[in-house]
Amino acid sequence: MTGAAAMPTVLIVPGLRDHVDAHWQTLLAMELRARHRNVCVVAPMGRGDLDCAARVRAIECHAQAIEGPLVLVAHSGGCLMVAHWAQRSKRPVHGALLATPPDFEQPMPAGYPTIDALRASGWLPVPRQPLPFPILVAASRDDPLGSYERIEALANDWGSRVVDLGHVGHLNPASGYGHWGRADTLIDEISAGAAQTRVARA
């Protein structure tokens, strides 16, 4: 990666989980900081309170506190948080990496929120308008929280290019991740596009 001064700040948006030391987003934040990259993390809010609006406010609070260009890196339910936030916020964003968004419109496995609970908490309907900034949706071929075909259709509605990750489950520790090395490449791709946009406008 290039120097922090030339690159956007990375804002990491977790899904419906608590803090997990072994999660790739946790490890990514540590790695970025070790490389002197500007990074902020929206604190995980667990599943005890599913209020979507509270999570959208948390993204907005962090985004508005960051000066300069911004890239979002979201996972799972965090991807849908970003979609809801993008409908409400005027904060410019240079790009977003949305990794394995879940399909909240279909029943999920036991232990995950029900459709009724998600609707009552403001997650449904899922926003399907094009997002107002460039995005990459990284989708899994065997995600237990959403079929590849339905996530691909959602990504198309958002105006996103789809990155086929192959068989990576839900890209979480239960699926063997851990460190996710490809995140670096995809973040660099989004960040480089942001830098090129700034040069073109100069």
Label each region the model flagged.
Residues 72-82:
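Gly/Ala-rich beta-loop-alpha elbow adjacent to hydrolase catalytic centers
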Residues 21, 144-150:
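Conserved alpha/beta-hydrolase "acid-adjacent" motif
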Residues 84-95, 104:
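Conserved hydrolase catalytic core segment
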Residues 130-139, 143:
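Short beta-strand/loop motif that positions the catalytic acidic residue
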Residues 15, 44-47, 97-106:
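Active-site nucleophile loop of the alpha/beta-hydrolase fold
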Residues 6-68:
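Active-site catalytic motif of lipid deacylating hydrolases and related acyltransferases
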